[in-house]
């Protein structure tokens, strides 16, 4: 983007909004000064460093950690409202209803521990196999299991 602006005749200076450059400079100075023990300065009482440099580094770490501690959050990904065994059976069919399947993350038995997309994609892929009547790979005879080789 900067190249496009410069080529159009504009003088552009890009700078991060957070963290400010002065905090980054102080962070690097502290890392160079305190080496592998830098993390102790997150809890200044562990270090008992009353020097101006020690106080500045502890303050810098506190300021840099403020944003993730206060502003970062986990997004709420609704899931498991129609979990397998409760609302849907093992073929993702809604129990007690004909011709209805749940094929998204709401069919998960419990919330995934990581990114929800992977679990949702696997439920969707399995639903596709179920709808098309494809068996589980584990139920196929070994000679029918697709094998991909590289040449």
From Swiss-Prot:
Pfam families, per the entry: GMC_oxred_C
Protein location: Virion
Top-rank lineage group of the source organism: Viruses
A GO cellular-component term linked to this record: virion component
InterPro entries: FAD/NAD-bd_sf (IPR036188), GMC_OxRdtase (IPR012132), GMC_OxRtase_C (IPR007867)
GO molecular function, one term: oxidoreductase activity, acting on CH-OH group of donors
Keywords in alphabetical order: Virion
SUPFAM superfamilies to which the protein is assigned, alphabetical: FAD/NAD(P)-binding domain
UniProt cross-references to PANTHER family, sorted A to Z: CHOLINE DEHYDROGENASE, MITOCHONDRIAL, GLUCOSE-METHANOL-CHOLINE GMC OXIDOREDUCTASE
Family, per entry: Belongs to the GMC oxidoreductase family.
Name of the protein described by the UniProt record: Putative truncated GMC-type inactive oxidoreductase L893
């Amino acid at each position: 983007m900067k190249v496009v602006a410069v080529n159009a005749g504009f003088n552009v200076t890009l700078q991060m909004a957070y963290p400010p450059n002065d905090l980054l400079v102080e962070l690097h100075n502290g890392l160079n000064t305190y080496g592998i023990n830098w993390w102790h300065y997150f809890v200044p009482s562990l270090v008992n460093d009353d020097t101006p440099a020690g106080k500045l580094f502890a303050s810098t770490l506190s300021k840099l950690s403020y944003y993730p501690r206060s502003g970062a959050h986990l997004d709420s990904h609704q899931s498991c409202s129609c979990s397998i065994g409760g609302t849907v059976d093992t073929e993702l069919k809604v129990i007690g209803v004909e011709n209805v399947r749940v094929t998204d993350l709401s069919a998960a038995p419990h919330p995934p521990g990581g990114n929800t997309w992977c679990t949702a994609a696997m439920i969707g892929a399995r639903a596709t196999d179920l709808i098309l009547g494809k068996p589980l790979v584990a139920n196929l005879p070994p000679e029918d299991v697709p094998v991909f080789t590289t040449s």
